[in-house]
Amino acid sequence: MTVTLPSVYSPQEVERKWYKYWEENGFFHTEPDEREPFCIVMPPPNVTGQLHMGHALDNTMQDILARYKRMQGFNTLWLPGTDHAGIATQAKVEEELRKEGLTKDDLGREKFLERVWAWKENYGNRITEQLRTLGASCDWKRERFTLDEGCSEAVKEVFLRLYEKGLIYRDYYITNWCPHCKTTISDIEVEHLEREGKLYYINYPLEDGSGYLTVATTRPETMLGDTAVAVHPEDERYRELIGKNVILPLVNRPIPVIADEYVDKEFGTGAVKITPAHDPNDFEVGLRHKLPQVVVLDDDAVMNENAGKYRGLDRYEARKKIVEDLKDLGLLVKEEEITHSVGHCYRCDTVIEPRLSKQWFVKMKPLAEPAIEAALTGKVKFVPERFTKIYLNWLYNIRDWCISRQLWWGHRIPVWYCDECGEVIPSREEVKSCPKCQSTKVHQDPDVLDTWFSSALWPFSTLGWPQNTEELKYYYPTSVLVTGRDIIFFWVARMLFMGLEFMKEVPFKEVLIHGLVLDAQGRKMSKSLGNGVDPVEVIASHGADSLRFMLVTGNTPGNDLRFHFERLDGARNFANKLWNASRFVLMNLEGFTPQGIKQEELTLADRWILARLNAVIDRVTAFLDEYELGEAARELYEFIWDEFCDWYVELTKPRLYGKMPGGDTAREVLYAVLKTTLELLHPFMPFITEEIWQRLPHEGKTIMLAPWPKGRADYENPEAVKQMSSLMEVIREIRRLRAEVNVPPAKRGEVILVTADEQLTRLLNENAWAIAALAQSEPRVVPKMEVPQGALTGVAAGVTIYLPLKDLIDLEKEKERLNKELKKVLAEIERLNQKLNNPGFLAKAPAEVVNKEREKLTAFYREKEVLEQRIGMLSHEL
């Protein structure tokens, strides 16, 4: 029994209703069974975050795949969750405390963590609720959090097993210190940005008074921690100085001149200062030469007690003062303006300070090797394939991973220290006393683990590991990971090596990479530019289906996507087009019960639309299997808008309105095509398709569990497609000719179709009704004819078309209108010629502007030619 649709589509009302229905009926939930599994783990968004366009794209793509596989009969689990986001979340709560005039230290660790958990409870559900408005068909009953009990147990277990294997160690090392976030961050959390700076040339006096050694540096404030000057062993200029001492300016400490191949002879003077405590390369040089490590900056990037009289100065103030003092001493040779790469914290954009500190590290080489092998042997595949090379290059050059963070919010490192004997005690349980000396004076490491450490375990920790649960056995390895190209190193690579280490299998078989969502000008969306678009607002104004469809049709794997409001409006127009066509179909299906399609009763249009439906089923299925989601969506858009709505629905009207026989057959075909098309479109636009599908005769409780459409052999009909294509070409050309001279749509007249081809003649005569209905013209088919006077001429599909104008338009008025158009065009040609002949314009205007104006001029000349031809033809007739 069909039920008609309201005249206007209201997305908000429809979306709320159906999401509630799906969730309450448990359609998203699944348990292991005998079916083939399909599993996706959601990249966990920050628990305190808000839905942004990147999330909207990422989760739309995952939802399309989940809904598609569910309809194909797979046991489909899309596992959702959120990330505790150490630095970001702690910063949010500290910001709140600052408003109250407090710091985290005022509260103490325990009370501060209570505040963070309270913040998480207040704001943690915001993003998951926003994902619901997008239509995400996740199994919310299985929602996880990286700090929940199960994930915390997994994190502790992984840390301790790696520690026991010797793959986690603690050592002094140069790390990336963020003075604003007050923590170490890993190499890949550092953004290297090109910045203007200066290269300072400084004279270091030789200890024997025989002269100077000139070094070049961009960071004179760190010279207070220099413990050597290095030159290349093959640099003839300095060979005799190797082994001698220079006096460190401002500190007056003798330091050696050493030879090391690390030095670039061509950079600066070929002599470089070595500061092992404040530069990663210098640190390595220092280890090779057993140099002391002098730290001169504290946690706030302020000069410390080793900086002498500069103690207490901010690093940039110290730089300024040191340069002034060097000038006064006559030791500053020169300053050179340069552009160089400067590391910034990816969270807060503060300039990173390389700094010596004791941290926890994961030894990466043994873990990277299996992850490299997995990509080389095809155990894991990247889509597009070009990202395999990017992934491998990073793993080939990987450094040990610094995993400790100087934060309170996160997974605390499961290691205790004995205050009496210094014993290091890794433990799964809380340590009360030292196993070595039995002292009860023990304390836990204050640091927490890098957020990405727990995220790296996501594909197996969320399925119950370290317990060997039914879910873990059934759903692991997961099927595909959908994620942005910006976190291949942060997350994808780490999940791969952790999965291989602890599960002995890759965590996912394929990685589908998408790009970033940029603004219309191709810029990253950011608060500072004020160019962000809020998906929640877009859903409120245009509906979730329109946003989803716009995002996916503008997307190709691995490439960035530009957000255009015009395309969003286009997606909404598409939803309205589908709604209106469906409303028409439903109005004509009242009291209809499907009986099945009888081939012998089908018209050419029926046979054509069913054959085209078959092709669309095959193409959409193939595109989805290849992760070409944008191509699949475009295929559906063109079929629904152009072929179904604009052609087939229009061609059924004479039959439905009783002007021709075959109304029942038209209803059967309309029903079959609309229902199947809705099922194909459902993964992309879940809400509107459910709303319409539920009003059609159907089996089952929801479209999301309807079987995925399959092509039918009896729908195949290449001949019908070929014939219909010819008929459509002829109709389009007649329409074009009528539009050229502004024939009113209601004005009907004769059109002469000239062809000697018997098959074409039969096709045109049998479908004269279609030409009359869609081209508002009465066709007369003849084998040959001279060009009639006062007729427009066209050619389509091997048919010559004559459109006599005499009875269609007022020839005098049309000539007058065309002359006015010609006058405007001539004025534009004159204006553009003057502009393009102006030397001032050509000299000042950008090349693309000049080219655009030239293109306009060419187009106007073409228009002038067409108008003159039409005026000539009308003048001849008059």
From Swiss-Prot:
Catalyzes the attachment of valine to tRNA(Val). As ValRS can inadvertently accommodate and process structurally similar amino acids such as threonine, to avoid such errors, it has a 'posttransfer' editing activity that hydrolyzes mischarged Thr-tRNA(Val) in a tRNA-dependent manner. ATP binds at K527. One of its GO terms (cellular component) is cytosol. The keyword Transmembrane helix does not apply. PROSITE patterns: AA_TRNA_LIGASE_I. Belongs to the class-I aminoacyl-tRNA synthetase family. ValS type 1 subfamily. It is found in: Cytoplasm. ValRS has two distinct active sites: one for aminoacylation and one for editing. The misactivated threonine is translocated from the active site to the editing site. A motif ('HIGH' region) lies at residues 45-55. The gene is valS. InterPro entries: aa-tRNA-synth_I_CS (IPR001412), aa-tRNA-synth_Ia (IPR002300), Anticodon_Ia_Val (IPR033705), M/V/L/I-tRNA-synth_anticd-bd (IPR013155), Rossmann-like_a/b/a_fold (IPR014729), tRNA-bd_arm (IPR010978), tRNAsynth_Ia_anticodon-bd (IPR009080), Val-tRNA_synth_C_sf (IPR037118). This is Valine--tRNA ligase. GO terms for biological process: valyl-tRNA aminoacylation. It comes from Carboxydothermus hydrogenoformans (strain ATCC BAA-161 / DSM 6008 / Z-2901). The keyword Electron transport does not apply. Its EC number is 6.1.1.9. Keywords: Aminoacyl-tRNA synthetase, ATP-binding, Coiled coil, Cytoplasm, Ligase, Nucleotide-binding, Protein biosynthesis. A motif ('KMSKS' region) lies at residues 524-528. GO terms for molecular function: aminoacyl-tRNA deacylase activity; ATP binding; valine-tRNA ligase activity. Residues 804-871 form a coiled coil. It catalyses: tRNA(Val) + L-valine + ATP = L-valyl-tRNA(Val) + AMP + diphosphate. Transmembrane segments: none annotated. Monomer.
